[in-house]
A protein has these predicted regions:
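Transmembrane-helix boundary motif in ABC transporter permease subunits
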Residues: 11-41
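Short helix-capping/hinge motifs at transmembrane helix termini and TM-loop junctions
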Residues: 27-31, 60-62, 74, 142-147, ...
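Periplasmic/extracellular loop-to-transmembrane helix junction in inner-membrane transport proteins
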Residues: 1-14
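Hydrophobic alpha-helical transmembrane segments of polytopic membrane proteins
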Residues: 149-185
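Short cytoplasmic-facing helical segments at TM-TM junctions of multi-pass membrane proteins
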Residues: 79-124, 150-153
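Short cytosolic juxtamembrane segments of multi-pass membrane proteins
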Residues: 187-201
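Generic hydrophobic transmembrane alpha-helix motif, especially the helices
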Residues: 41-78, 85-86
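Transmembrane alpha-helices
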Residues: 69-73, 105-139, 167
């Protein structure tokens, strides 16, 4: 059951987070985009999941792409907002120092601003790991006629077989917790130098 939903979760999570990151960089580089892109991005975050899932099935079919599309929609906005906040978190004096050395936008981004934004981005990655799992499971309620964790929960709940329902719920919870723990461990290795990470050790 977990293998069935894993492909949609992983691919949707990677695509959604990557898209959110790239749009955040574009908005930061060209601030005029903020007026056009942020309202649209905010709108996508407010779309009801139960309404999106059937539409995704109609567009992409019953296989994993429809679930991945729902996951992309759920994970895009948190990554966008967190990355934008992280890019603004670098110290103003440090930015002025880079400017005084005539550092380009790209050099400042890679040397100063992205490292400062790392904890913000990892926070979004961890939250999105749970959102991705939830999104894929809910999407399976509408578009997985024969398999999947969401399908199993739906079918067994209809049969009042609460044992299997709870088993599926526990599997989902454990999977989400493991993903969160792995990302937290990766964060400690990647951003070990950041005060917010050192303070958690």
């Amino acid at each position: 059951l977990v293998q069935t939903v894993a492909k949609a979760v992983v691919i949707g999570w990677v695509l959604g987070c990557s898209l959110g990151f790239l749009v955040a960089i574009a908005i930061d580089r060209m601030p005029f985009l903020q007026r056009g892109l942020l309202p649209i991005a905010s709108l996508t975050s407010a779309i009801p999941l139960v309404g999106v899932a059937p539409i995704a099935v109609m567009w992409f079919g019953f296989e994993w792409p429809s679930k991945a599309a729902v996951v992309v929609l759920m994970t895009f906005f948190p990554m966008l907002v967190s990355t934008l906040a992280g890019l603004q978190a670098s110290n103003r004096l440090e930015r002025e120092l880079m400017h005084s050395y005539a550092a380009s936008y790209t050099r400042t981004l890679w040397s100063l601003r992205l490292p400062s934004a790392t904890p913000f981005m990892f926070a979004a990655l961890k939250v999105n790991a749970s959102l991705a799992l939830i999104g894929a499971i809910v999407a399976e309620f509408f578009g997985s006629p024969i398999s999947g964790l969401g399908f199993r929960i739906s079918v067994e709940a209809t049969r009042m077989n609460m044992t299997l329902v709870w088993a599926a719920v526990v599997v989902a919870a454990i999977t989400g917790s493991l993903a969160y723990a792995l990302l937290s461990r990766l964060e400690r290795r990647v951003a070990f130098w950041h005060p917010s990470v050192r303070g958690r050790k």
